[in-house]
Amino acid sequence: MSAGLSELQRSVLRILCDTFVPSIKVSDDPTGFWARAASELGVDEVLGKDLIERVPPPLRDGFLALLDNLAAQGFIEASQDRRERILKDISSSSPEAAGGMLFYEKQTLLLTYGLPMQPEPNPTVVTYGAPKGQNPNWEVLGYPGPISIPEAKPKQIKTITPEGDNMTLDADVCIVGSGAGGGVIAAKLAMQGHRVVVLEMGNQYNSSDFHQLEIWSYQNLWYRGGATLTANGTVNLLSGSTLGGGTEINWMNCIRTPDLIRADWVKRFGLEGVDSPQYDRYMDTVEERLSVGSETAYFNAHNLRMREGCQRLSYQTSQTRINWDPNRFNPLMAGYTGLGDQSGAKQTVRRTFLLDAYRHGAKIMVHCRADRILVEQGCAAGVEAAYSDPQGRTAKVTIRAPQVVVACGSLESPALLLRTGIGGPAVGKYLRVQPGGAVYGVYEEKQRGWWGSPMTANCTEFVDTGDGYGFYMEIPAFAPGFYASVIPWSSGKVHKEIMTKVPYIATFIWFLRDKGHGEVTIDKSGNAVHTYQLSDETDQKNFRHATATAMRIHEAAGAREILFAMSNRLISWKRNQSESLEAFIERISKEPLLDGAQPIISAHQLCTCRMGNDPQTSVADTTGELRDVKGVWIGDASACPTSLGANPMITIMALASRTGDRIAQRLGGRIAMPNTPPPSYHSVEAMPRMPTANVFEMIPQLATNMFREMFGLITNPMNMFTLGNRILSGLSAGGQRCERCGMTGQPGAGSYCMSCGHSMVR
């Protein structure tokens, strides 16, 4: 244990972890699951080390004070029941105490079910990255853990590092952030011959680094090490922080900007051209570069349960289009995509646009946090940043550039502007998080939610409930540690009972197009502070509607039990109980929503530096450029004027491509779509559209593609399974057929296609 904790604090921490995950004697315990306490896995050791090395000093002092408080109440000597009562009493004493206890609870559960262990002879030593590491709790959950050792491969992008304490570079444009927006702009400008420098706060990883271990992934790929709670304790924020940004960890649902949103942005915010064919071409180009398609979007058990339930209720569904390379697709690895894709099938920004930028001369630096934007005479002059790597090397980095793109993501972009003191009164003011929740269905047969492609069947029945707002329902891919941490803890015994049900659980999640908004500010040290409250009446109505809808779909799909999480307890409905499901839903609808009463998750943060035509309510003008500082551009999800009600990756990229053209004009370049390498076509839908006059020139290519697909079916039996699934999916898809993209299972009349955004009219 770290020397930063006293002996008494170490003892209290060990007992605290064992209170959350206790040793319980039962008559039948063949795997030792019930008898195994958290400390037997070394959880208290890891948590204590994290407290000292990872938690900022002000928070750390508060967490350690809680340990002292527990010691003063006789926590070490108390029985399990007494300790549980002490924890509940402390949590109810103040919001600060509740937040501290929640930290210990969530971290203990995450580590107990997520940590791998070294093999014998020293089973108490825990490592984050042991390639062959296993966790003894995984056996009862049916979780395989890591299934393959990654192949050693060199990184395709060679990043630059400072050679001394100070480093200065000259560039035409400095891009802060390497995610969906920053990567697209970097490629567009570098491929036109401009000098591009990209700064990324996180590190670079590739498939060689991905060992399919969730704790390692959260700490290295995710923003602030995993689910980050807002400052007011209401929303868990999920975001990427690595080279490639959120595209490295997302679940790949590629949805085009809905027509409804595009029209609204033009009418209310003045974003000229967003409703035009030119914007369609922006989306077409990024989809082509990402190999977006539905070839590998088949249904695992969770997705089948949603589709079955929706069909029985006559709810509209759609099949996801995802950015997989079909030639590399492996369903055994697909469920680990949120932990970093080992197979190389996932077409992330790192593997596509950033690689294009690098091959055209862009310089990319990781471990580099932008402190402020340099401004001279009202114009951008560059970026001042701090380099700090895991080896302890630090340096001051200055990029001199007349154009600066802020693309740090909606959680960090406003913080950079606030640290610089630019952007106007709306900076950080309109944080949309597309708030979401989850309902768990327990089925008779095992569901194995970590196997196969996540998020392939979606319920689109309520994307627009009449006023342009509603909710979208889909399927996640959770690993055991995350499951354990999001299931509320009421007692050690109850939580273990619920965890034994995990193999049989299918999880339905949803997110809203939110009307209400939160805010991003900075603290005294300049760090981003996020607040959000689900206080808007429309948002509350839609959140409750989504909860009820998920329960009805589970019931229709055959779930024997439905579990709904409040922040401090789990509420259950069973099929054989006297209370009807509708009565249960009515009872749940009276539960509070505000102040963290129900767990809310956000994977999509937007609008904190939004574009628009009103200087009081927007940060950038309608082209993406700041009004008060020329040459500073917004190039990420924070530029969106409103919430989308759809997964935002394609929209972020299309808007970034639009903004990139404006920057190219400023630099004296041309407006042109990126010259992407020709993709490998695997379906008629993906074939390039050619003029009728050239139809005979297509025949040799058509024959080549037909042979390639048939050869793939012969040499890889899994491709045959995928093809069969595609055929069955097409036969069973209900609802409308989109005239633009041909996808079936679409929303009802008057709505829009959730695949390509086209307006749907019967």
Segments predicted by a language model, with ranges:
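Short, cysteine/histidine-rich loop/knuckle motifs that typically chelate Zn2+
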Residues: E739-R740, S755
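Short Cys/His-rich micro-motifs in 6-15 aa windows
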Residues: G757-R762
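Redox-cofactor-proximal catalytic regions of oxidoreductases
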Residues: P56-P57, W216-E295, T507, F511, ...
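Glycine-rich loop(s) and the adjacent beta-strand/alpha-helix scaffold that form part
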Residues: V184, K188-E214, N236, T242, ...
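Conserved redox-cofactor binding core of oxidoreductases
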Residues: L110-T112, P119-Q156, I160-T161, E272-R372, ...
